[in-house]
């Protein structure tokens, strides 16, 4: 991997790599940033890296295990990455363990990652952590993509990291906990980014991390925000990051009509469920006061509701449905979950179906967070060369989740 990274970096600075260099330069990256992250390029010819490494003395079996090549019966070993800007992925100790590639032009898939190997496990690593771990800033920033991390580091926010093409895992959250007690979540401001943030928050809080969410609106991502507003404005957004519990409650507003008395009542019941989940009484009381003040309800009324729901256990088992939406019966929910589970089984057993299904179904269509996460992993593995059920199972450390998977 180290030799491959050197090769890609060299290629970026040749005439063949001009397209890749122009792309990175067009995204505002300096030569120093390109060097710091070891960015490179793999050109349109699909065997240059293979020939380079063969000349270095590597045999085919080692190259096959590296994840850098695809074996073709007709053409032999072909480079996995071609016509792409290359992002070397390093572990916390700065060892190159894999690569990400962004296609030049309109080819598919737009982004391609190394498959999992003996040294590369996406669920246990974070892009940019080898640099962020040395930051003097008190927290870490978790964002979505390579360019988000790179642009933030270039702008001076050198505490940014990103998950590697998958939803944030508990192992990645635990990895961040080694270096900080607080994480700022900066995902894209679109609907997909909001859903990703809501899935990440429990992972982060589950390992004891204080978690806040940064508002990027009206811009989509950190790179776009910094380009338009500058570093000082971005720093201000970091300082104003919203407490994750209040963010979760605010996001629930979208499902209710707060101008309607019944809608507001249903929303507040849903907010109460979130407050019930807070075990520490002092912490819960602080949130009670904040929610009561924001939504104009007496603290004692809210406290009484939380107490009643906590005693009944309803906060853990029931969901208030938004007004004017169809209420699904348990039998119907069970049928939907069974159908989705069957779909995941088909996708795992017959990966060739995935290419056809993608036109009609995306991971976001799965209604339960666990099934949605599994679907994302299956599709990612498919685009990286093959679906491996054993590796899917290993992504889940929770025994109940493993049993369900």
Show the residue positions of the predicted features.
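Phosphate-handling DNA/RNA-contact segment within nucleic-acid enzymes
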Residues: 1-4, 22, 43-179, 183, ...
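Short alpha-helical scaffolding segments that buttress acidic/His motifs in well-ordered protein cores
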Residues: 1-4, 8, 24, 38, ...
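Non-catalytic interaction/clamp surfaces of large macromolecular machines
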Residues: 1-35
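A generic alpha-helix surface/boundary motif
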Residues: 17-22, 47, 146, 269, ...
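Short, well-structured alpha-helical segments
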Residues: 21, 34, 50, 299, ...
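Helix N-cap / loop-to-helix initiation motif
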Residues: 30-31, 59, 298, 367
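Substrate-binding/catalytic subdomain of NAD(P)-dependent oxidoreductase enzymes
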Residues: 39, 51, 288-291
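A charged alpha-helical hairpin associated with nucleic-acid processing machineries
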Residues: 91-92, 133-140, 167-183, 187-405
């Amino acid at each position: 991997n180290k030799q491959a990274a050197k090769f890609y970096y060299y290629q970026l600075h040749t005439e063949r790599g001009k397209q890749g260099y122009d792309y990175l330069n067009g995204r505002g990256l300096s030569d120093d940033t390109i060097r710091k992250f070891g960015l490179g390029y793999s050109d349109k010819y699909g065997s240059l890296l293979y020939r380079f490494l063969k000349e270095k003395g590597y045999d085919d079996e080692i190259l096959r295990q590296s994840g850098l090549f695809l074996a073709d019966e007709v053409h032999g070993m072909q480079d996995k990455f071609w016509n792409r800007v290359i992002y070397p992925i390093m572990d916390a100790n700065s060892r190159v363990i894999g690569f990400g590639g962004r296609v030049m032009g309109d080819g598919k898939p737009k982004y391609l990652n190394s498959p999992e190997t003996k040294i590369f496990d996406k669920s246990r690593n974070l892009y940019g952590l080898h640099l962020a771990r040395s930051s003097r800033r008190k927290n870490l920033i978790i964002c979505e993509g390579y360019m988000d991390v790179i642009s933030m580091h270039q702008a001076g926010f050198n505490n940014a990291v990103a998950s590697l093409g998958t939803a944030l895992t508990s192992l990645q959250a635990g990895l961040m906990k080694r270096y900080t007690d607080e994480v700022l979540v900066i995902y894209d401001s679109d609907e997909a980014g909001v859903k990703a943030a809501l899935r990440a928050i429990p992972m982060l809080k589950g390992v004891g991390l204080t978690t806040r969410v940064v508002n990027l609106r009206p811009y989509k991502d950190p790179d776009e925000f910094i380009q338009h507003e500058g570093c000082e404005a971005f720093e201000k957004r970091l300082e104003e990051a919203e407490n994750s519990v209040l963010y979760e409650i605010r996001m629930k507003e979208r499902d209710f009509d707060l101008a309607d008395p019944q809608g507001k009542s249903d929303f507040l019941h849903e907010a109460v469920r979130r407050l019930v989940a807070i075990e520490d009484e002092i912490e819960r009381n602080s949130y009670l006061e904040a929610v009561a003040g924001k939504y104009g309800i007496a603290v004692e009324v809210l406290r009484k509701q939380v107490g009643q729901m906590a005693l009944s256990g309803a906060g853990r088992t029931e969901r208030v449905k938004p007004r004017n939406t169809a209420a699904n019966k348990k039998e119907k929910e069970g049928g939907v979950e069974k159908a989705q589970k069957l779909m995941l089984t088909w996708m795992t057993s017959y990966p060739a179906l995935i290419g056809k299904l993608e036109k009609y179904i995306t991971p976001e269509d799965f209604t339960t967070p666990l099934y949605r996460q599994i679907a994302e992993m299956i599709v990612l593995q498919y685009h990286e060369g093959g679906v491996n059920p054993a590796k899917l199972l290993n992504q889940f450390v929770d025994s109940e989740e493993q049993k369900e998977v």
